[in-house]
């Protein structure tokens, strides 16, 4: 039933688009791309290697622009540009279709972040909204998860996350009685919340968008720092001890990991420097 509803919605969207005559759609399409290419550019010159870098940069922006304006963020494993092909697996050729993606359908933040940092510094701010939207709409679920699992406030962002906020099931584990994923590579890997907050703070500094700051950036960043403040014990007043913790995916057991400390210090310093009008 859900798949038939999706097909019906897709058909309605196509029908709405078909109502726009090609004679009108084509000029609007061309104007969009003209505006896109003239709002920022880099054309390195001097050597063939420099020119090759420039072509790669332009291609990367084109790929991102073609995929970044949908309802969801760009998928790191193929984006819109998945293709038919073959995979050599232990000497066996295995067919797969254009909708097949290695690593599945979740968002892995370490990979998802890459095109969005590039958009930020290219000035392609409008293309970042699907990423903000996904996390903004996941906040109620993330708050409820923290309350249910750990009996305190705040939010933590999973490294492998469905659009609605929860872990990839294969990482969390079927019939897992614990509140931590069974996959050791992401069991306590929550650094993405700090980096996401940092990206949002940069976005606000670039754009000055106060509505974004009030409705997206501050609720998410506040939820992240609240989680760290309430989840970990204090060794003395005002001094938390981040353990047990992780350092990226690399070190599965860590105490006071460097990325967590630097992330929190940076984000908290920047949050405290925001104007009072945003509070």
How would you describe each model-predicted region?
Residues 63-66, 112-126, 190, 194-210:
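Alpha-helical support elements that line or immediately flank enzyme active sites
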Residues 107-149, 260-275:
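Glycine-rich (often Gly-Gly/Gly-Pro-rich) flexible segments and glycine-rich loop motifs
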């Amino acid at each position: 039933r859900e798949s038939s509803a999706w097909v019906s919605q897709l058909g309605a969207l196509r029908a709405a688009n078909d109502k726009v005559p090609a004679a009108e759609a084509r000029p609007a399409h061309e104007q969009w791309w003209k505006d896109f290419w003239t709002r920022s550019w880099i054309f390195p010159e001097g050597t063939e290697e420099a020119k090759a870098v420039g072509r790669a940069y332009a291609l990367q922006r084109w790929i991102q622009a073609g995929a970044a304006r949908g309802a969801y963020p760009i998928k790191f494993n193929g984006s819109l540009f998945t293709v038919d092909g073959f995979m050599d697996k232990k000497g066996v050729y295995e067919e797969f279709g254009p909708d097949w993606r290695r690593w599945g359908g979740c968002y892995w933040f370490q990979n998802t972040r890459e095109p969005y940092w590039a958009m930020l510094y290219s000035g392609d701010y409008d293309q970042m909204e699907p990423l903000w939207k996904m996390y903004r709409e996941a906040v109620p679920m993330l708050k409820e998860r923290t309350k249910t699992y750990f009996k305190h406030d705040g939010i933590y962002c999973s490294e492998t996350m469905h659009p609605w906020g929860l872990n990839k099931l294969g990482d969390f584990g079927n019939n897992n009685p614990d509140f931590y994923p069974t996959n050791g590579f992401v069991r306590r890997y929550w650094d993405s919340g700090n980096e996401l907050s940092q990206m949002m703070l940069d976005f606000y500094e670039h754009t000055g968008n106060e509505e974004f700051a009030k409705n997206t950036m501050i609720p998410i960043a506040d939820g992240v720092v609240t989680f760290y403040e309430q989840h970990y014990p204090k060794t003395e007043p005002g001094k938390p001890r981040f353990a047990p913790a992780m350092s990226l995916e690399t070190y599965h057991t860590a105490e006071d990991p460097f990325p967590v400390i630097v992330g929190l210090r940076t984000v908290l310093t920047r949050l405290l420097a925001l104007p009072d009008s945003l509070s």
